[in-house]
Structures are given as C-alpha cells and as structure tokens.
Amino acid sequence: MSKLLNNNNHKNLTNYLKFGKGIINNLNNKSKQVGIISFISQSSIQSQSSIQSQSFLSINNNSNNKYFSTKLNKNEKISEKTTTRKIEDIYQKKTPTEHVLLRPDSYIGTIEKIEDDMWVLSNSMFNKEKKTIELNNDNNEKNVESTTTTTTKTNKKPLTYIHPIKATYIPGLLKIYDEILVNAADNKKRDSKMSFIKVEINPNENSISIMNDGKGIPVVMHQTENCYVVEMVMGNLMSGSNFNDSELKVVGGRNGFGAKLTNIFSKEFTVETVDKSSGKKYFQRWSNNMGDRSEPIITPIGEGESDYTKITFKPDLEKFKIKSLWDDNILQLMERRLYDIAGCNTELMVTLNGKRLNYNFQSYVKLYEHHLNNSTKREDNEEQYREESFEFGEISPRWKIGIGLSETGQFTQVSFVNSINTVKGGTHVNFLADQIVRYVGEKLKKKHSDLEIRPMNIKHHLALFVNCLVDNPSFDSQSKETLTTKPMLFGSTPEIPESLLAQFVKNSKIIERVAGWALMKQKADLIHSTSGRQSKTTLIKSISKLDDANWAGGLKSKECTLIITEGDSAKSLALAGLSVVGRNSYGVFPLRGKLLNVRDVASKQLLSNEEINNLTTILGLSHKNSYDTDESMEDLRYGRVMIMADQDHDGSHIKGLVMNFIHYFWPNLLKRGFLVEFVTPIIKATKSSTQKKSFFTIKDYEKWRETISSDQLKQYTIKYYKGLGTSTSAEAKEYFSNLDKHVIKFIWGDEADDLIKMAFAKDLSSLRQRWIKETDMSQGIDHSIKEITYPDFINKELIHYSWAANLRSIPSLIDGLKPGQRKILFASFKRRLTNEIKVSQLSGYVAEQTSYHHGEQSLNSTIVKMAHNFVGSNNLPLLTPSGQFGTRLQGGSDSASARYIFTKLEPVARYLFNELDDPLLNYLEEEGESIQPDYYIPIIPMLLVNGSEGIGVGMSTSIPLFSPIDIIDQLMLRLNNQVALKKLIPWYRGFKGTISPDRHTYRTNGVIKLVGRNLEITELPIGRWTSDYKEVLNDLIDKDVIKSFQESNTENSVHFTILLNNNQLEQMEDLTENELIKLFKLSASLNFHLTCFDENSKIQKLESVEEIIDQFYKVRLQFYGKRREYLLKSLDNQIKRLTTTIQFLEVIASGKLKIQGRSKQDLIKELESGEIVGFENFGTHPPEVYQHLFSLSILDITKERIDNLTNQLTKRKSEHQSISSSDPKSLWTADLQQLKEYLEKSDKEFQKKPLKTSSSSSFDVSSSSESAKLSSTRKSKTDKIKSK
C-alpha cells in the first residue's frame, strides 16, 4: 500500500482502489454523512475543489471535522452495544465516481428540485403543453421522432425577449449540460478558425447533442496513461489540459471535472471527434454512469472531412428524480443558456435544433430591455429597440459591457467569464459597477447636493451586462456562479472610459431617476414620521410661539383660521387685530425668516426642520391623507391658513413658499380653498384725519401721483410701510374691522399645478429662466378683488420677487456691479470718502442714503469683499482694506469684525468712474428720495476686470477676471478702428501659475517643482485657498504618497515643502510636471456663465468675452457723446454767467451803475432798459441768468476779483474750444491713457505682460490626444501612486 501511495502512476492507484471493492460492497446502509480523508500523495493531481484524492474513506458520524471523529448521534448512549459495532460498519471507502454520485453537491450542485428566479425566453421553442418543438423561422422545421409529439412550424413572429420567471429546475442537471456547452465555446480560444456550435435537444428521446468544429482532442495514445487521450479526458476524473497554472488561459475549464461529470450523470455518453492532423475519426460510448465503457472505434477520415467534436449524452433522469426533460423549466433554461453563448461569441454560428441564434452582444443584451424597462404592455410582434436604452462599450478586446437602467427596483447583472454564466456576479461585476456608481454619485452630488443618496441606492437602478475574458479564473465552487479572482489577476484592467459614462448619464436620465426615487423615499419617511402626530383635540403646548385658536382641534376646527405671520413683529400686529374679531377661531404662528423650499431636499433635512414640523403639527396635517373629501378635512385642526406677510418682494416669496409647501404634499388643500392672504397698505397718503388714501402696491401709488399736481402732492403726508411692523396697533384694529377689504382668497386655476412646480422645482430652472424673460413685468395684482388664482399670483406677483432676486444676484454688463455694490459706491462718492471710516459706520451710512432694507450685516460683507486684494479676489478693488479684511489663507472668510476695520475709496475708483459722467446717470427713486443710479458708466468694462459670481432665480453667473491693461489695449484698438489680434485670456493679479485654454473654458494650474529631495508648491490654482489645500496633502499622507509637509505660507503667498522618503522620491522623479500637477490636485477650471443685465435692464446670456466688450463699447461710446454735449452746454452756461458777472462788476466799478441806496427792483429796471453800455441785451435774458448778480459781495468789485473771473472765463473758453474740436472717441482715448499710466505707476504687476499662458509642459486636460500619448509604463506608475 505504501508503495502504491507513493507511486504517481494513475493506473496503479486505480488498481489499488479496486482492491477494496469487497469492503465497499459490505458498507452499512445506515451511513448518513461522509468524512473525507485524502490518501493521495502531494505529488498527485491537485484540484481546486474540496475533493483532492482518488480514494475515499468515510466514517458514519455527524461531525464537521475534516478528519476522524466519533461524535455520537443524538439518541445514542455509550454502551457495550455501541462500542461492539463492526469496524466495517463505521469506515467505508468510495471510488471517485461513487463519491461524485453519492455527494453531487460538491461537483454539480444539488440534484433536488429548487425554485428560483431565472432568465428565460419569452417564446421558447419548447412547448411543454403540446410537447412539441416550435421553430419560428422559415426553413428550420425540425422533426422529433415520437409517436406522441410533433414539431410545429409557425408563421407568427412573436416578440422575443428574455425575462425572469419563478423557475423550477434541477441545478445539477443544468450544470452537466453547461459543462459540455462551455467546453465547446472554450475551443474557440484554442482554434480561432472554429465557426459553429450546433446543439440538438430531443426531450422525447432524452438526448442532448453538442457539436462544434475546430481542432478537438488529439486522437493519439497517451504514453503515460497507456490509453487514448480522448478516453482519458472524457472518462477519467481530474484529467484535462488546464492544469498548467504557469500558462495563462482564458477558458472555462480549470479542475479536470467538466465532461466527466456529464458522463457520470448520464445513462449513455458518446464522443465523436475528427482529428485531421492524424487523419483519424474517433468514436466511443460510455454507459451506466461511466461505469461501463466500450472500446473506441477509430477509422480513417473521409476526403474533405474537417475537424469537429460531437458529444451526445442521455442524462440519467432517475438520478435527478424526474421522468422527462419536459418536466419543469429545465428546457427553457438550456435554451436561454445557448442564447448566452451566441451573444458572447459573435464570431460563432450557434444553432439550436437547426434554428440559428443570430445575436451579437448588443442585440443579446437588448433582449432584456423589455423586462428592465418594466414594459408590461407591448404589441405582440418584433420590436426595434431604442438604441439609447443601453450604452455599449468595448473597453478592451477582452471586455465588453452594456450599461442600462433597471426599473425593477434592484440591481440587475448578467455576466459571463470565458463564456461561463456567473449567475451571482463576482469581482468582475463589482469592479465595473463601482466605477459606474462612483461616477453617477459625483454627478448626483453636484446636481442634488441636498439629497441623501448612498452608493447602493444608485446601484439598485443599474442593469449591467458583462462579457469578459479572465486569465485562469477562480470561482466560489465547481458550480462557478461567482467569480472570486482578484481584479489585479484579471490579466487586463477594465477601466470604463469617462465618455461612455457621460453618455450613459445623459441618455439614461439616471440622475433624474435616482433623485426621483430619493424624493419618493423622503415622502415615505414623512408619512412614517407623522403617523404618530398628536390628535386634533390636543392643545400643542410645546410650540411656545403658537397662540392657538380656542376652537382649534375641537368640533369647530373647520371654522378656525391659522394666521402665519412674517416674524414676531407681524405677530404682534395680528394679535392686536384679533382683539376686534376674538381668539376663538383665530390662531397666530410667526415664521422665522423664510420657509424651507420642500422640493428636492433630503428627508433628513425635512424631518429636522423645526418650522415644517411645527406647521404640520399645528394644522394637524398627515402625510397619509390626501384631503380630497370633506370627511378627510375634519381631521385638521384648522380649516384654513391665512398668510400675513410684508407687501414687498420678500413677502411675496414667503407666500409662495407656504403655497409650495402645501402643494407639494397636499395639493388638494389648495384646490379646496385652504389658503388665503391678508394684505396691508405699503403706502399711505394723509391729507387730514378724514382724508387718507391707502395703496397696496408702489405702482398703484405712482398711478395716483400722476393724476395730481406737485402742489396738490405737497398737501399730503406720504408714509411708506416697508414692513408690517410699521403699522400701529390702532391700524391693526382698523384692518381687522374690515376683513373683507384685506383678505384675498387663493383659488385654483388652469395650469396652477405646472406653474407652482415651475416656480420652485430645482430641475425646472430652464423653464423659470424663460418665464422671467418672457413675462410682462408691468403686470401686477389688483388688490381690490376678492379672489386671486394661483397662476395670477405666480405670473403677476411672484415674478416680481424673482426679478428682484436676479437684480440682487446678477451684475450689470455696463458697470459690473450688483445693486448692493452700487449702493456702497454711490454712498462713498456722495460722502467723498477719501478719509478712512469704520466699515460698520459706512454700512449704516449706505443704508440711510440708499433706502437699503436687507440688513447691515449683508452690507458689511459686501464692503469687505469690495476691498479684497489677495490673489483670486479683485484685480482692481474699489475700496481700501485697512485692517484684517481677509486673506488667501481662507479666501477672505478670515476677516475681522466690521467694528474693527476701516476703509475708504481707492484712488483708482474715480479714474474708472469719472465724475464728469455723474450728471448723465439715471438716478433711481425710493420712498420719495433720489438714490443710486440704475448703473454707472466706467471707462472700461469692470465686469471683466473684477469678474462676478451670483445665483439668482432660474439663472446664475460666473465670470472670471481679466487684465485691465489687456482690456484698455483692446478698447484702444477699436477706437482706432483696428482689429484686436489677441484673444483675451483670464488674468489674476499676483497669480504665479499658468492659465491655458480648456475646451470651452480655461484651466488654472498651480506651481510644483522638485527641489533637491523635496517637492515645493509655490502656487495654488485659482479658487483653492491655502488652508483648504492642506486637506489634499493630508489625504496624500494617509495614502502613503508623501511622508509629510512643512508650511512657509504667508497671507499673500503659498509655500508648501513636501517631504518624501526614498521610495516616494523615486516615484516622483519619474513623473513629469503635468503629472505632478494632476497628482497633487493643482489644477482647476474657471467657470464661464456670462449672464448679466444689459443697459435696458434685460437679462442677457452672452457667448464670449468679446461680446461683452462689444456691447459695452457701444454704450460707453454713446455716453461719451452725451458727456461731450453736456460739457459744451455746461461750459456755455458758465461762460455766459462769467461774462455777465464780469460786465456787471465793471459797470459798477466804472461808476456807470450806481447801486447805493437803490432798491433791487429799481436796479433790475435800469439794467433791462438797455441804456447802460455793455448791458444792451440784458432784458432779453431770463431772470435766473442774472439773479446771482444781486448776491455778490462788496469784495467782488475789487480788481483782483475781476481779474480772477476773467482768467476763469478765458480757461472755460479754452476748454470749450478743446471739447468742441474733439469727438467721443478722442475723449475716451484720453481717459484710457490716463488710467493706464496710473495703473502702471501704482503697481508693477500691471507693467508685466498679463497674457500669461501655459508653457508647453503645463497640464491641459482638454487635450485628450496629449493624455493618450502618455506611455503605459508612466501612466501605470501614476495610477499606482494615486490608488495607494
């Protein structure tokens, strides 16, 4: 025995096993479990299965011990009877074949019937009811020899698709079929000339035949085993050609079981093969579960006969406990499995019972579309599937994928490794799915940052199809349902191209699908959260700011009104008014600021929002109820809601947000008249205690004012009510005494549903943009009516808030300023702010002078930003920062309190905004006072100099900064009628990095260099702040890319020293500067959204920087013409005034006109007589021309004063002559030259060449071809560093 165990000869070992056959025949039938002990030596054939031997010894016990165990059965007791059992009854020996039959689970899976979800064809050719094979295509009729069944040929072409059913089948039976099928497909890898696989399934004869051409098994004797190779690999376990693991193969077979398992579980198994190289044809039959074999029949091949292999077997149905292949769903699964083979092996002609399965991978995948798109109603005919249903990509010759949407609510994967159907997926599927989920997740985060979405939520919406080739694949078991090979051992790296992922996201709308699912989940969470709300009869004492109606939550709940006020001051007004109508049916609840826009927000945010929770509780609302019946309305604590907000734009927005909240969750409430509003006057004109006029809109007041004269207007006292807090308690009682005049009911109207969604849904911004541009802004609400439709509220009132919000957020093309900035500049000019003032004091002055109503804190922030001068902020700040205004360390957020810092106008401000233009501006009016102009007229487009960022309603703007010197040069060329040759490139004052074109935008790169053994970073890309960048470096430390870093940063400069160990240094030395920039995230794109207001206050979305300059140029040149006209007219008046004054003083000094002791009227009469020399035409002038003469002092008659006035006159005439001889272009050119000289003297930065573009070595992501040129070695090194 020892000799046999140490002998590698397979035949000797087999003979030894036969030696114990007598013992095996006497085994006790009570044996229920088998413990396996290997007696094969280490040099014997090894297998990846749990069975590694050719002889088996079993022990009758229930232990899981791998080796010997004597664990007793539950009911056994230690006794003499137990211990005296025959040793032969305990220990048994099995041959490998017997062990396969005894324990099939370890080899082919269970041989018991199971029920599971499996993919099958919609119109199988196997008709179980009729027991016929129905071929749908012409000329493919197949006869099945049987006296009880027939083959039917049908002319109808039903829709063919693959869908899941609850299939009943035997996994082991499917597996033995699949083993032969995969072997046939594997042969294509061995012989590229192989062209077909033909499968014949005859269920009535219990016969399956699989044939393929191409080189098969050599018909030669195996010198070691002394038998034909065909017999060895088809009739002996653990034999085959796939045991050399040093050789990489992309086939399905690995362990030497394969076809032998099919043989063992068949009553009859035959192999027929032609070996053209040896000129022989081989035929051999096995029967009785491979127990009996016939001698091989070898004949010479005929002329023209080619290589092929044909396996025919009849499964042992008794072993599988079925009577026929027609039983259950096994035939449908075998059929679909052949479709898999056809889809994965495009170059092969695959046929089943003579019917060709003509599919490639794409057309195969589309067979699943009907189910994945949840299509339950389709016409019963062939359908051309939409190409955009799936995105396909051949990542490499080894990897083909299809990505689609799964509308079934769960992740769907269909995958194949070397033609093996990995039913449960594995590492290959996970590797690809993770890439898709990661990409989609990043896009979702950008578009729906407020939604809580986990990677698994995205994965549940995916359908992923994979057909790949993997070197020497490893599986979880012999059934090969799950690939376990590590990605690094695949033999290739399947990185999905970003272009394919982008196309999938665009065409599949997966972003919208996942976001929609998340919103539905939020609603479900809300339903759950409100299911335990207090009953309507319970007073809600926990909400401290609620003044509850006495009847709320009682039998008279539907008679109650909840007044929602804008803040506490409005609540006080409401409570004062309730003293008139009583507290039984009215409750009051103040909102803190604006209500949350409940659309497109995470459920967590909704559930944690105190205002939303309070309103829901106070009103007794339930997310389970739709409130579509009178009966359901009785569950509410209040019968209606009355909004009491300010009559300004923000008040309209608050109304809209309350409306949106109710519409989003309970639209039926709006349809049932649940919402009303309480309106108050915004202006009151009082003439006497009995003569008062109230106006609910500014437009109403302006219309009234146009109907009366200025003298009549002076008889009125005008009072502006900017907030409800302005009204007195007496006025509140007046309002509530006449509720009909102040309460307006909202009613449903056509398009109400769509308009409310349009106004508040984030994904409808394009519609909002068009709505804002196309709506007539002259329209307004008539507050004399008693009812307003929701569409009218949206189109005539809320639109004004949207417009005002855009005015606050979107800059002017002409001066580059937003209203807040313009107010600050106006107040600074008005105050002549050349001396420092505290920022907090300036903001107070601005609010006072410009009627600013949004809080001084907002002004403080704007003032600080207008004074920022660090890299990435302003190229030309208009205010001076004196103190800590913030630095590039934290992007300006590190500024000191407004109480401690000072500012004043920068000298350059008046170079840019020439004082001569001030009289030409159109100054706005508010509360009867003149405030800032609608826009200033700088001499260069400040929109490009300092850039702008802003988000409005339905639109946003993002404009980079450009060099003022470049802009001046461009304007100079235009003024000289020359074409600008250079294209403007973004420029940031003090920036040391590079800026280069990148598709439709520009990319900014920082600076990193290898200095000695360290890396030094001396600049960051625009928009990345020093403190924030340390997170990037810490992440690289965690990934062992760098050792550590040191900081030498200042408030104005960047200097990081990166410390490296020897290994890291070696890796860095092999990277180019571009690759270092990419690795250290020193590159960022500049956003270009060129949205702004033009000179007519129309929103424009421009396409290029040059278009901004063009429009600015036209407007600015017109204003230089206006300036010239104004100056000439002004100088004419000054010349006339000076001339008259000089003449008047001269006649007095000469004694021609005596003024002593005379009345003013007498002097005027003498001057108008024309009798005084030099004043002949005095009487022709209007009085305002000479009224100033009578306010002159006695000192003005002196010679010195007359000489001074004469010099002024000469100067004014010279100026008049100069301007008369000039044109608008020359005036503008002079201003530009003056500005350029000032800039070049004030800062050396402006003396440098501003058009700094990237060098040839800079990293440019727009150049995909450049990226492709990276060598595979270098790229792999970079990826390796990053992946660590």
Curated annotation (Swiss-Prot):
Its main location: mitochondrion. The record marks R899 as: Transition state stabilizer. Keywords: ATP-binding, DNA-binding, Isomerase, Magnesium, Metal-binding, Mitochondrion, Nucleotide-binding, Topoisomerase, Transit peptide. Residues 445-447 are annotated as: Interaction with DNA. GO terms for biological process: DNA topological change; resolution of meiotic recombination intermediates; sister chromatid segregation. Binds two Mg(2+) per subunit. The magnesium ions form salt bridges with both the protein and the DNA. Can also accept other divalent metal cations, such as Mn(2+) or Ca(2+). PANTHER family: DNA TOPOISOMERASE 2, MITOCHONDRIAL, DNA TOPOISOMERASE/GYRASE. Belongs to the type II topoisomerase family. This is DNA topoisomerase 2, mitochondrial. It comes from Dictyostelium discoideum (Social amoeba). The lineage of its organism: Eukaryota, Amoebozoa, Evosea, Eumycetozoa, Dictyostelia.
